[in-house]
Design a protein with these regions (language model features):
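Divalent metal-coordination and catalytic microenvironments
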Residues: 8, 28, 48, 63, ...
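Active-site neighborhood of phospho(di)ester-bond hydrolases with catalytic His/Asp-centered motifs
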Residues: 6-7, 43-47, 76-82, 102-107, ...
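Conserved catalytic scaffold of divalent metal-dependent phosphoesterases
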Residues: 91-192
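Metal-dependent catalytic neighborhoods of phosphoester/phosphodiester hydrolases
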Residues: 16, 49-67, 80-99, 105, ...
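N-terminal active-site segment of His-dependent metallophosphoesterases
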Residues: 1-66, 71-72, 361-372, 376-377
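Conserved beta-sheet core of the metallophosphoesterase superfamily
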Residues: 95-98, 181-252
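Accessory, non-catalytic peripheral segments of nucleic-acid enzymes
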Residues: 37, 42, 246-378
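Active-site neighborhood of divalent metal-dependent phosphoester/pyrophosphate hydrolases
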Residues: 40-58, 75-87, 167, 173-190
Length: 378
């Protein structure tokens, strides 16, 4: 059974003020073409369909068109991610089932499943929406769970993985040891980390949440990554669609098909004169790419953004890196990169004020306090 694995569409996303709708539509057409070529038996959408819990009208319209055409090619299984509203995404779910679209309902203590079959027998596809410990604790108040790993283990405990069937899981969590990008939502310390061992027994685990395609602790546990580059930390990514081919139980093959963006997202560095030299950009895709330009001139270039924009009209970010900017950089700002979690930022502030880092006991206490506040707000 061939499965097409997608996640983190983030429809309606804006990157540095630029709308990605046209770029998303361009790549979604490629995905539809790939689905028609590869003819998968099921298509898995593993969360973060939208970029916001209340998506824009144009994002909803784009997904409606994409989903309608996708469901004509194969059954579609969808779970909600941390950027989605589980309630809004699940609206009309029972009606959608008649059109071969299966959406994870709001979590109520059970994990919904879809059963498909091929020449090797049945395949159970389990739909686990994005969960925090608080969501699971509400449904299992007497269960012991200190970590998100405990919570996910409890949530999956009702699935019989010893029935001889092949089992596929859709999930939207951060698996410990995986590589993050700056465009992803940060957790408090390691509070949302999930050990890959909770997925033991599944034949394939289709993950969403992280933007870089990667295995997560084992070959059968995988993130497919985003279809587009959504931050400059992804500038070197090669975006693709993942296909998982399930044979008889225990037999799994993974392949990928590349995706090409309408506009690439790149980082440029150099002096103003270097970047504006015709021989530098002629014959390249730089004038049509989204760019973060870092000028290394020692003096600010007057009207730099406007002047650079005559050659590079899609500049998302302009910054300087020279002796002056490095000297005036605040020590905390120098360390507080966009990928720092809230706990890491507290740790940096504590170190700046006290000339030492928090000890383990202080970190654990702070993590529990912040986690408790976040859970109370859910």
């Amino acid at each position: 059974m061939k499965l097409m694995h997608l996640s983190d569409l983030h429809l309606g996303k804006r990157v540095n003020g630029f709308s990605m709708i046209a770029d998303q539509q361009f790549v979604l057409e490629q995905i539809l073409d790939l689905a028609a070529q590869e003819q998968p038996e099921a298509i898995l959408l593993c969360g973060d369909i939208y970029d916001k819990t209340v998506p824009s009208a144009e994002a909803v319209e784009l997904f409606d068109e994409f989903l309608s055409r996708l469901a004509e090619l194969a059954p579609v299984c969808i779970i909600s991610g941390n950027h989605d509203s589980a309630e809004r995404l699940a609206f009309g779910g029972r009606l959608l089932q008649k059109a071969r679209v299966h959406v994870s309902p709001v979590y109520d203590g059970t994990v919904s499943a879809v059963e498909l079959s091929d020449e090797f027998g049945p395949v159970q596809i389990h739909l686990l929406p994005f969960l925090k410990t608080a969501h699971v604790r509400r449904c299992f108040p007497d269960a012991e769970m200190e970590t998100t790993t405990d919570a996910i283990r409890v949530a999956l405990s009702g699935i019989d993985l010893a029935d001889g069937k092949r089992h596929v899981l859709l999930a939207h969590q951060f698996v410990t040891g995986s590589e993050r990008c700056e465009s992803e939502e940060k957790s408090i310390g390691d509070s949302d980390n999930v050990a890959s061992s909770v997925f033991d027994g599944f034949d394939y685990v289709a993950l969403g949440h992280l933007h870089g395609p990667q295995r997560a602790g084992a070959d059968h546990i995988r993130y497919c990554g985003t279809m587009l580059k959504y931050s400059f930390s992804e500038a070197n990514h090669h975006k693709s669609v993942t296909f998982a081919q399930l044979g008889e139980k225990g037999n799994l093959q993974i392949t990928t098909r590349p995706l090409k963006a309408q506009r690439d997202l790149k980082m440029l560095r150099g002096t103003y004169e270097e970047l504006m030299a015709r021989e530098f950009y002629l014959g390249t895709d730089l004038p049509e790419s989204y760019l973060h330009i870092t000028l290394t001139d020692e003096e600010d270039v007057p009207e730099a953004l406007n002047r650079l924009g005559t050659v590079y009209p899609y500049i998302m970010k302009l910054s300087y890196d020279n002796t002056r900017t490095r000297m005036r950089q605040n020590p905390l700002e120098a360390q507080a990169e966009p990928e720092n979690s809230p706990l890491e930022l507290f740790d940096l502030l504590y170190e700046k004020q006290n000339n030492r880092k928090m000890d383990r006991e202080q970190q654990e206490y702070l993590t529990k306090m912040i986690q408790s506040i976040w859970e109370d707000s859910l």
